[in-house]
């Protein structure tokens, strides 16, 4: 007699470029036959690139709820909540698993109202510092604590994030928070590196002795591109190497970024804006260093993908960064908001091809098993089963 499948309704904020989309896609596509998964999500915000091509690449279909938007809105939130309840009524899930803040609020509210047996939430990052003022931040903490108390389980994507959620922000007790790191299809980043590098260098007109430095991510205040531009200004005065800087991404600060690029270009800096690049695996292979300057992060995907591409990395010390970079081995971790220290470490990588090569090789060894999606699937299946057992 066939065993009844465990039905999982997976709800994600929105299908934009980033870790949550990959995470939700792999968990929908690759769970074993013991599970049946339905994926639901909102659409990207204005200025964001959608990630529906990622779902298409892996043959995943999703239900789109256009009313589920990042910013709170009474009317659209109420419509989204009702649509989620309708989906739950029809699908009859054993587990509702929400990913990120808006999906976590609306999805869990719908699941509680509809008496879903097991309700799980993953924090892909959090908004408890560097996003809002004190009053709004405290309100969000209050809401998250209330939701966490009713949830069957809470997932953090790094050990540091678990500590922040439990000890600093008091969202839930540490023993109720399970750490399950993200997982990715990393092999595509590591294959045919020489051919991919040659293609990108040719496409962008880069010579052999050019050092290509990129920052990849949403053009939003939290990503702190302003710090990156400060670093560029310091660097250009302190090396004779031929440098080319790339800004990859898009978002609300696009006009600011374009103005800064125009200014730096007038000062003789070769700096280029690409918007989003879909084939990031090929692009990465052509880079020499990939940077992250964020004020706050969960687990920054661009840094994992860079190391899978055997590219050296440098990042501010935020969120789960220490869980994904082997400091002084695959890259450098520096204090946030300190352009001088960041520039000094970046100069080491600029000046030494041998260090870049060593860091790149170490990076691939560091991430290839730790962040592969097969590990993610195994961890999540075991966690789901344990929660189902607890519910019996």
What is each of the regions a protein language model found here?
Residues 150-176, 184-188:
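A short, active-site helix/loop in glycosyltransferases that binds the activated sugar's phosphate group
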Residues 327-328, 332-339, 348-354:
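Conserved acidic donor-binding segment of nucleotide-sugar-dependent glycosyltransferases
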Residues 10-18, 22-76, 161-166, 252-254:
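N-terminal strand-loop element at the rim of the active site
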Residues 21-26, 211-234, 252-258, 340-341:
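A conserved mid-protein helix/loop that constitutes part of the nucleotide-sugar donor-binding site
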Residues 312-315, 325:
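Short hydrophobic beta-strand element within catalytic cores of glycosyltransferases
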């Amino acid at each position: 007699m066939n065993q009844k499948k465990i039905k999982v309704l997976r709800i994600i904020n929105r299908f934009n470029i980033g870790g949550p989309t990959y995470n939700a896609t792999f968990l929908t596509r690759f769970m074993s036959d013991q599970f049946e998964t339905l994926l639901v999500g909102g659409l990207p915000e204005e200025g964001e690139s959608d990630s529906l091509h990622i779902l298409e690449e892996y043959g995943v279909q999703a239900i789109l709820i256009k009313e589920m938007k990042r910013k709170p809105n009474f009317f659209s939130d109420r419509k989204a909540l009702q649509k989620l309840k309708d989906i739950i009524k029809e699908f009859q899930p054993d587990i509702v698993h929400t990913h990120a803040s808006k999906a976590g609020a609306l999805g869990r509210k719908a699941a509680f109202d509809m008496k879903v047996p097991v309700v799980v939430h993953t924090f892909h990052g959090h908004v408890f510092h560097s996003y809002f003022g004190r009053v709004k931040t405290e309100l969000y903490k209050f809401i998250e604590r209330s939701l966490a108390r009713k949830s069957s389980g809470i997932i953090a994507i790094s050990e540091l994030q678990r500590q922040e959620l439990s000890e600093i922000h008091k969202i839930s007790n540490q023993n109720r928070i399970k750490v399950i790191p993200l997982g990715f299809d990393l092999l595509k980043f590591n294959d045919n590196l020489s051919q991919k590098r040659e293609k990108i260098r040719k496409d962008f007109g880069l010579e052999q002795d050019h050092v290509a430095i990129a920052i990849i991510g949403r053009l939003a205040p939290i990503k702190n591109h302003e710090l990156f531009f400060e670093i560029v200004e310091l660097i250009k005065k302190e090396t004779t190497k031929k440098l080319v800087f790339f800004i990859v991404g898009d978002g609300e600060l696009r006009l600011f970024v374009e103005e800064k690029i125009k200014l730096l270009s007038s000062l003789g800096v070769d700096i280029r804006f690409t918007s989003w690049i879909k084939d990031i695996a090929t692009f990465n292979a052509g880079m020499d260093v990939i940077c992250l300057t964020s004020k706050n992060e969960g687990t920054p995907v661009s840094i994992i993908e860079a190391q899978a591409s055997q590219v050296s990395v440098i990042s501010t010390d935020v969120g789960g960064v220490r869980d994904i970079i082997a400091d002084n081995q695959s890259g450098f971790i520096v204090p946030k908001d300190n352009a001088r220290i960041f520039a000094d470490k970046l100069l080491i990588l600029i000046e030494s091809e041998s260090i870049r090569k060593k860091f790149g090789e170490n990076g691939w060894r560091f991430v290839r098993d730790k962040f592969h999606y097969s590990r993610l699937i195994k961890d999540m299946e075991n966690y789901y089963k344990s929660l189902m057992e607890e519910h019996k």
